Regions:
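A short core secondary-structure module
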Residues: 207, 211-251
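A glycine-rich, basic-preceded beta-loop-alpha segment at the flavin cofactor/substrate interface
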Residues: 246-248, 270-298, 315-332, 466-479
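Internal helix-loop-helix
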Residues: 80-171, 218-220, 424
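C-terminal amphipathic alpha-helical interaction region
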Residues: 455-541
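Extended, charge-enriched "interface" segments that sit outside catalytic cores
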Residues: 1-110, 129, 540-541
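Flexible, small-/acidic-enriched active-site or ligand-binding loops
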Residues: 248-274
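Alpha-helix capping/hinge segments and adjacent helical runs
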Residues: 4-5, 22, 26, 32-45, ...
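C-terminal helix-coil-helix/basic helical segment that borders enzyme active sites and/or dimer interfaces
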Residues: 349-382, 398, 471-480
Length: 541
């Protein structure tokens, strides 16, 4: 006998057939404005592919089936390997096919390649964020290695620049594609890498023997890691491959995988170097300088990844509100809910504008002024955006209600993932101290800010007032005010981009909402309509 106790209605269908690129008006505009309009058709193709139920299911599977550490084989021999679910490998294959790991480093890379790569990264991050960790590290390490690959590894250049993902356990020179990891932090130091105790001994052939450990060694299956270790000349950077030139495994012992709050798909490991062999990059004592060259790019990716996850959470929320009816009308038409969603969309508008201006600065970093822009605003963006992510996703959960608190909605996974980008590559205080370091020591930084703010001076009174407040704080930037200064700098960076490129009503609305310290700002109906149209590709009004 068949029972039917009720009919299911007024429940939105899953958001699993959307174009992640074309539905984001702010992103489409930013890509073209910042010099990568030539990639728009390809981005639309990627956006359609990644927005499907099949792609989204890969993200789910990779997280509910986390990696497994294989220390030994059945006969007791060391393996020091990690086994991943097939979904992980398919996600990685798509990332490499779309060149998210090396687009900007191709010999014939087009102007705007960094911008195009940022957009591709953002689209993939909305499907599954953990797989971006190996991609980020490989992207940041590749330009350094193209200049400094040790002599025994010159055959790595071709696979470093390929569009192939190769998970086979083989020496790098025999593979079609490569991944590069980084090993910096140790038990006693964390962000204080100068306290690292891993020690080295120079060998007759010019290589070094490493003895020590790393506390967080992400992507242990990488073909090589860039490792910080102590030498007679100070903290130095070493190229430590998985396989030695003679084909033997390097003595890198995988001890334990971290049991993390989020980022479940990605393997983070504790390792020990038991006479591992590495090759010095640069000179002894240059470790910090070389790591900082890569650190800016990894920090940018942290901010971009958090922004992408915020974008996905917002998409889920507004899609639900568009279909769900309450008190006789769609939820999105309820005044308070419409105001909440519009404020969320406005926040994303400002972040998108600043992040892709940053991508352009990275693309043109050969210009001293652009390099300084990236140097200042990258840590500021990482600090603010990564901190905003958690309450933003929680707000999206509230839009969905109880179902948003359930795993099927994607939102719990996004919420658990959010804190990692605030911690990786330097936590909040480290970012703020870095901003203060630039403000106190970098020549030309105040001229740069003055030029950026003068360009839009007089267009909005809230912006001008905020500039004056920041100027007062910067007369003597105290360390204990580092967070406030960094936050204000970020807001003014966003505001300057909005005033320069957004419609005047939207730019002024952004400035009032984000910079008016009194609060209580009501967005006009027209601004709300414009924001929600842009945020959904013209679907939700």
């Amino acid at each position: 006998m068949h029972w039917q106790t009720h009919t299911v209605f007024n429940q939105p269908i899953p958001l699993n057939n959307s174009n992640l690129y074309l539905s984001d008006g702010a992103l489409c505009e930013a890509v073209t404005r910042e010099g990568a309009g030539w990639d728009s058709d390809f981005l639309a193709s990627i956006g359609q592919q990644l927005g499907t139920a099949e792609s989204l299911e890969l993200g789910r599977l990779a997280n509910v089936n986390p990696p497994e550490l294989l220390r030994y084989d059945a006969q007791g021999r060391r393996l020091d390997d990690v086994r991943f679910h097939p979904a992980w490998h398919l996600l990685m294959q798509a990332l490499c096919t779309n060149r998210v790991h090396n687009l900007a480093w191709e010999e014939d890379a087009r102007s705007g390649a960094f911008v195009a790569r940022a957009a591709r990264f953002m689209l993939h991050a909305q499907v599954e964020a953990g797989s971006l960790c190996p991609i980020t590290m490989t992207f940041a390490a590749t330009p350094l290695l193209l200049q400094m690959l040790p002599a025994p590894f010159q055959d790595w250049t071709t696979p470093l620049l390929s569009d192939r993902y190769d998970s086979h356990l083989l020496p790098g020179g025999q593979k079609r594609g490569l991944l590069i990891g980084m090993g910096m932090t140790e038990k006693q130091g964390g962000s204080d890498v100068m306290s690292n105790t891993t020690r080295t001994e120079r060998l007759e052939d010019g290589s070094y023997r490493l003895v020590g450990h790393k506390w967080f060694f992400s992507v242990p299956q990488s073909d090589a890691h860039l490792v910080l270790a102590q030498t007679a000349g100070g903290l130095s950077c070493f190229f430590v491959p998985r396989f030695l030139p003679d084909g033997q495994r390097n003595a890198i012992r995988l001890e334990r995988l971290k049991d993390k709050l989020g980022n479940r798909s990605n393997a983070s490991c504790e390792v020990e170097f038991q006479d591992a062999i590495g090759w010095l990059l640069g000179q002894e004592g240059e470790g910090i300088r070389l790591i900082l060259k890569m650190g800016g790019m990894t920090r940018f990716d942290c901010a971009l990844g958090s922004h992408a996850m915020m974008r996905r959470a917002f998409s889920l929320a507004i899609y639900h509100a568009h279909q769900r009816h309450v008190f006789g009308n769609p939820l999105i038409q309820q005044p308070l809910m419409r105001h909440v969603l519009s404020r969320m969309a406005l926040q994303l508008e400002g972040q998108t504008a600043l992040l892709f201006r940053l991508a352009r600065a990275w693309d043109r970093r050969a210009d001293a002024k652009e390099a300084l822009w990236a140097r200042l605003f990258t840590p500021a963006a990482k600090f603010v955006i990564c901190k905003r992510g958690m309450p933003f996703v929680a707000e999206a959960m509230e839009v969905l209600g109880g179902i948003g608190y359930c795993e099927e909605s994607e939102l719990p996974r996004l919420y658990r993932e959010m804190p990692v980008n605030s911690i990786w590559e330097g936590s909040g205080n480290i970012m703020c101290l870095d901003v203060l370091r630039v403000l106190n020591k970098q020549a030309g930084v105040y001229d740069l800010l003055s030029e950026a703010f003068v360009e839009v001076k007089g267009q909005d009174r809230y912006f001008d007032r905020a500039v004056r407040r920041l100027q007062q704080q910067l007369r003597k930037p105290a360390e204990e005010l580092g967070r406030e200064i960094t936050h204000q700098l970020f807001l003014l960076g966003c505001g300057a981009q909005m005033l320069k490129y957004a419609s005047p009503p939207m730019a002024q609305a952004w400035c009032q909402v984000m910079l008016d310290t009194r609060g209580g700002v009501r967005l006009s109906e027209q601004i709300q309509n414009d924001l929600l149209l842009r945020a959904t590709g013209g679907v939700c009004v």
